[in-house]
Design a protein with these regions (language model features):
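Feature marks short, highly hydrophobic, charge-poor N-terminal signal-anchor/signal peptide-like helices
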Residues: 1-9
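Non-transmembrane interaction and regulatory regions of membrane-associated proteins
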Residues: 61-62, 107, 145, 149
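Generic structural motif
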Residues: 34, 81-83, 109, 121
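Terminal, regulation- and interaction-focused segments at domain boundaries
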Residues: 13-54, 58-60
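Compact, glycine-rich, soluble single-domain proteins
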Residues: 51-55, 59-102
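C-terminal partner/receptor-binding element of secreted or periplasmic proteins
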Residues: 121-153
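Beta-strand/loop substructures that line and gate deep hydrophobic ligand-binding cavities in soluble
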Residues: 102-129, 133
Length: 153
């Protein structure tokens, strides 16, 4: 009988993880600025931070225009080569290039409110452990500082 309760407990834990992980992995912040001001402020703040680079700003409203009319929506791709080099010097860590460069989303909803969405890099890094965890945790904290400069929360 106790094995049944163990299995029930495992099933419940699995369901809890299944439903809470998306809420933990993706974080949404409301911007106190307009859409254009948010994209500009985030890009400029990254450029001013030591060792950070903005690699691209992708305008999805423009890109998807032939297919659908969207509100304003973009992603900003950024990188810190110093942090990246700490991960990439070890061959066994190079598979995480699938998560590089880092990025965040900026979008305007149908009500005109502007939001920033981002992966929880610290939590993501913990899934890998070691150097990846250490570096992604530090990078995630630095990215959070940038977002706080335009966020209401």
């Amino acid at each position: 009988m106790s094995i049944i309760w163990v299995l029930v407990g495992m099933a419940l834990m699995g369901l809890i993880v299944w439903f809470t992980m998306p809420l933990l992995m993706l974080v949404k912040h409301k911007s106190k600025l307009s859409y254009d001001e948010t994209v500009t402020a985030l890009s400029e703040t990254f450029k001013k931070k030591e060792d950070w680079r903005v690699l691209a700003v992708n305008d999805y409203q423009k890109t998807t225009e032939p297919f659908v009319k969207l509100e304003r929506i973009a992603s900003i791709n950024f990188c810190n080569p110093r942090h990246a080099s700490k991960i990439l010097t070890d061959d066994k860590n190079r598979y995480v290039t699938a998560f590089m460069p880092m990025g965040l989303g900026v979008y305007e909803d149908k009500k005109g409110q502007v939001f920033i969405s981002i992966l929880n890099f610290g939590l993501l890094g913990k899934m890998f452990g070691g150097t990846i965890s250490e570096v992604m945790g530090k990078a995630g904290n630095e990215v959070t500082e940038v977002i706080k400069s335009v966020s209401t929360n």
